[in-house]
């Protein structure tokens, strides 16, 4: 069974991705700061159909200095790591002029520095194993911008540049690196949207609807599978045609 790390996977989009990968035959190793009721319920359900395929590792990904030891532990506990989904992230709502430097640094640390450092150490395991898959979760705001999300948008744009450059670095080692850029997905990060905001977003999209967690999970699952063996350095948008 191939092992895939999913960061920020205790709830919402990350957990949806983990569950989809498990359904496709992968072992999902979820990294998050703490367990959630949503994860515990999913674990009980998954154990009935795919025993031993969903695991939890408590870790604060903002602790950059501890990431090398985390990577070593996961390799020791689960063997070679086949896939990595850099999904963990955070945002701050508000215009840049009113955002503190500490808030900016916090978002950049978790959304940009952390996935880069984790990837650095996990990719070494992939190279030693002869291949692997990396999927970075970006966002359409990296392309479109969004008022009040300038710092968040900057971090997601950096992940896209990281994806394309890393794909060229590690391609010869049999490692595919891609990104998925979701539109506004119904998760905790979008709970602050009013119903009017949701309707506006839906009206702007070609398909006149918002995106579900399952839509994004399907894209990640495709990029982890054999059907995407010749796809690398690519960004797949899952936004119901919002950026069409």
Q: Where on the chain are the PLM-derived regions?
A:
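Conserved glycine-rich cofactor-binding loop
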Residues: 10-12
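Substrate-binding pocket helix/loop in short-chain dehydrogenase/reductase
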Residues: 95-96, 103-108, 190, 201
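Conserved glycine-rich Rossmann-like NAD(P)H-binding loop of the short-chain dehydrogenase/reductase
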Residues: 24-41
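Active-site helix of classical SDR
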Residues: 119, 155, 163
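Residue(s) in the substrate-gating loop at a strand-loop-helix junction
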Residues: 139
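Alpha-helical segment proximal to the catalytic Tyr-Lys
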Residues: 124, 168-172, 229
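C-terminal substrate-recognition "lid" of short-chain dehydrogenase/reductases
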Residues: 116, 209-238, 243
């Amino acid at each position: 069974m191939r092992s895939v790390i999913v960061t920020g996977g205790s709830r919402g989009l990350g957990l949806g991705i983990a569950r989809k990968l498990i359904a496709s035959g992968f072992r999902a190793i979820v990294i998050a700061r703490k367990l959630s009721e949503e994860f515990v319920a999913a674990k009980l359900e998954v154990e009935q159909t795919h025993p031993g395929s969903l695991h939890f590792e408590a870790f604060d990904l903002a602790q950059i200095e501890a990431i090398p030891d985390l990577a070593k532990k996961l390799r020791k506990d689960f063997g070679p790591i086949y896939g990595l989904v850099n999904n963990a992230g955070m945002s701050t709502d508000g215009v840049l002029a009113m955002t503190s430097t500490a808030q900016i640094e916090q978002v950049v640390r978790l959304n940009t520095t952390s996935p880069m450092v984790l990837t650095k150490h996990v990719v070494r395991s992939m190279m030693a194993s002869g291949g692997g898959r990396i999927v970075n979760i970006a966002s359409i705001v990296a392309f479109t911008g969004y008022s009040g999300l300038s710092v968040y948008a900057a971090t997601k744009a950096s992940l896209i540049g990281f994806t394309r450059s890393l794909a060229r670095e590690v391609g010869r080692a049999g490692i595919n690196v891609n990104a998925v850029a979701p539109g506004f997905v119904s998760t905790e990060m979008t709970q602050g949207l009013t119903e009017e905001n949701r309707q506006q977003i839906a009206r702007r999209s070609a398909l006149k609807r918002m995106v579900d967690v399952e839509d994004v999970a399907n894209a990640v699952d495709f990029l982890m599978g054999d059907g995407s063996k010749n796809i690398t350095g690519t960004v797949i948008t899952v936004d119901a045609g919002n950026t069409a």
